[in-house]
UniProtKB/Swiss-Prot annotation:
InterPro entries, per database record: TLV/ENV_coat_polyprotein
Organism for this UniProt entry: Homo sapiens (Human)
Motif (CXXC): 165-168
This protein's name: Endogenous retrovirus group 3 member 1 Env polyprotein
Tissue note: Expressed at higher level in adrenal, sebaceous glands and placenta. Expressed at lower level in bone marrow, brain, breast, colon, heart, kidney, liver, lung, ovary, PBL, prostate, skin, spleen, testis, thymus, thyroid, trachea.
Signal peptide: 1-22
Note on domains (UniProt): Contains the CKS-17 immunosuppressive domain present in many retroviral envelope proteins. As a synthetic peptide, it inhibits immune function in vitro and in vivo.
């Protein structure tokens, strides 16, 4: 089963491959393929984030500090790399105070043969984070003293004032190291900011020593001025060497929120616009599913994100009379969530082709050579043989275009198929299109989740069909000496009275039993009433969330017109929906506690 996302890493250095089953294969060369991006040939590592190996699992391979599982699908197919995981690495960390103290800095040690490790920190920063003595310097003049020596050294003892211990300096920025650590002053600009003006580079000269694995707790004194005995501080630095694994980041994170939101999104065509509710309804209706969630990613515009898949020659694509002919002319564009890697691309560039439609990274490329004036194929090399029959052989209107990309054509995709060109998909390409495309299918980017799994999501999900279980009135499930309210009601039944209505006809024991039963009835009625109020409170909370979400959506869509208030020019535009559900639940809990009677026994 192919994964949902295929990612790529471009290689510039090929490493020797050790084909030892069960051991890491350095470089993952068996998953490295020749690809074409425009006219540039590169070596690309192809892997799947989600993949189910139906063949033989061969072990793992390693590339760029990342470990991949390797699958042999069999039947002569190439190996598949999947399930990327960050390889364990060695890290040096500096903490303030203790091993569990604030992390001052960290660095990863790469197996590059270097015999030293460097970390940097700011003297003013460590003083403000963990000084054992009062810091008597806090002016900006102190923070900006970047032209003077910065000291950091073991103090004589924890009981001595810092200013009396400078003669026992072991590590400092103005003398040669006498131990396993060397300190170096980092020159900075005069207009530096707070906690960046007094930076020190701490170099670990022998990182392979066992002392770093257990950790070194170094008592350090710190001061800025090295010209005279001046104010200082006393802190502990804890330096430790760890082996740990960081999760592999698969997707780029926005470095600047404002940079991202200020980017203009392409205007979606009317045919591509869709509401999520309508799409979810269509999905449920088409797939005949119920009692599940239709889930998808964040939608930044008013169109649903789409996913693409290339149509392969061996795919069992149902050919009908309508699919053999081009689809009705349409200039609609579908914006794809991810880009795919094409195996049978068509590509052309040149002065005669002026309408760029997008670029694909391709394993195989049928391209138009403008210099030679003819269409050629290139795969692993420029001299590769073109596939036969052509991938377009099933479509008469496109088959001749595979061999003559420069020939005039309407470039309309067959019914049910699309031209996939990088991050866009088209029903019809422009007459003078330029770029690299494949023929394939697209579908909305969504997945289905059963209701039970939905309860594990991060945001609270309210199940309309599920109610809090309550104690039912059962018979014979109690111990002989236990009398909860339900058993009292079941045993005694309702009270009966004499025909003349005089209570004196009943014995005191009978009346006592009636009071006990009334007490039990009161508790059960209270619990049922409290349960009903809690349901109303939950419903009010859900309505409040829906109203806020709708208002947020309206303000987003009308952002250019200053939201709903600006659109309708409202002077008093307020939205206040207090969530009193928690208060109601607290009140009902007090009522239930007041009416509750513990299970009675014959002994009290």
């Amino acid at each position: 089963m192919l994964g949902m996302n295929m990612l790529l890493i471009t290689l510039f250095l090929l490493l020797p491959l050790s084909m030892l089953k069960g051991e890491p294969w350095e470089g993952c060369l068996h998953c490295t393929h020749t690809t074409w991006s425009g006219n540039i040939m590169t070596k690309t590592l192809l892997y799947h984030t989600y993949y189910e190996c139906a063949g033989t699992c061969l072990g793992t391979c390693t590339h760029n500090q990342t470990t991949y599982s390797v699958c042999d699908p069999g039947r002569g197919q190439p190996y598949v790399c999947y399930d990327p995981k960050s390889s364990p690495g060695t890290w040096f960390e500096i903490h303030v105070g203790s091993k569990e103290g604030d992390l001052l800095n960290q660095t990863k040690v790469f197996p590059s043969g270097k015999d030293v490790v460097s970390l940097y920190f700011d003297v003013c920063q460590i003083v403000s984070m963990g000084s054992l003595f009062p810091v008597i310097f806090s002016s900006m003049e102190y923070y900006s003293s970047c032209h003077k020596n910065r000291y950091a050294h073991p103090a004589c003892s924890t009981d001595s004032p810092v200013t009396t211990c400078w003669d026992c300096t072991t590590w400092s920025t103005n003398q040669q190291s006498l131990g396993p650590i060397m300190l170096t002053k980092i020159p900075l600009e005069p207009d530096c900011k707070t906690s960046t003006c007094n930076s020190v580079n701490l170099t670990i000269l022998e990182p392979d020593q066992p002392i770093w694995t257990t950790g070194l707790k170094a008592p350090l004194g710190a001061r800025v001025s090295g010209e005279e005995i001046g104010p200082g501080a006393y802190v502990y630095l804890y330096i430790i060497k760890k082996t740990r694994t960081r999760s592999t980041q698969q997707f780029r994170v926005f470095e600047s929120f404002y940079e991202h939101v200020n980017q203009k999104l392409p205007e979606p065509p009317p045919l591509a616009s869709n509401l999520f509710a309508q799409l979810a309804e269509n999905i449920a209706s088409s797939l005949h599913v119920a009692s599940c969630y239709v889930c998808g990613g964040m939608n930044m515009g008013d169109q649903w994100p789409w996913e693409a898949r290339e149509l392969m020659p061996q795919d069992n694509f149902t050919l009908t009379a309508s699919s053999l002919e081009p689809a009705p002319s349409s200039q609609s564009i579908w914006f794809l969530k991810t880009s795919i890697i094409g195996k049978f691309c068509i590509a052309r560039w040149g002065k005669a082709f002026t309408d760029p439609v997008g670029e694909l990274t391709c394993l195989g490329q049928q391209y138009y050579n403008e210099t030679l004036g003819k269409t050629l194929w290139r795969g692993k090399s420029n001299n590769s043989e073109s596939p036969h029959p052509s991938p377009f052989s099933r479509f008469p209107s496109l088959n001749h275009s595979w061999y003559q990309l420069e020939a005039p054509n309407t470039w309309q995709a067959p019914s049910g198929l699309y031209w996939i060109c990088g991050p866009q998909a088209y029903r019809q390409l422009p007459a003078k299109w330029s770029g690299a495309c494949v023929l394939g299918t697209i579908r909305p980017s969504f997945f289905l989740m059963p209701l039970k799994q939905g309860e594990a999501l991060g945001y609270p999900i309210y199940d309309e069909t599920k109610r809090k279980s309550k104690r039912g009135i059962t018979i014979g499930d109690w111990k002989d000496n236990e009398w909860p309210p339900e058993r009292i009601i079941q045993y005694y039944g309702p009270a009966t009275w004499a025909e003349d209505g005089m209570w004196g006809y009943r014995t005191p024991v009978y009346m006592l039993n009636r009071i006990i039963r009334l007490q039990a009835v009161l508790e059960i009625i209270t619990n049922e009433t409290a349960g009903a109020l809690n349901l109303l409170a939950q419903q009010a909370t859900k309505m409040r969330n829906v109203i806020y979400q709708n208002r947020l959506a309206l303000d987003y869509l009308l952002a250019q017109e200053e939201g709903v208030c600006g659109k309708f020019n409202l002077t008093n535009c307020c939205l206040e929906l207090d969530d009193e559900g928690k208060v109601i639940k607290e009140i009902t809990a007090k009522i239930q506690k007041l009416a509750h009677i513990p299970v009675q026994t014959w002994k009290g």
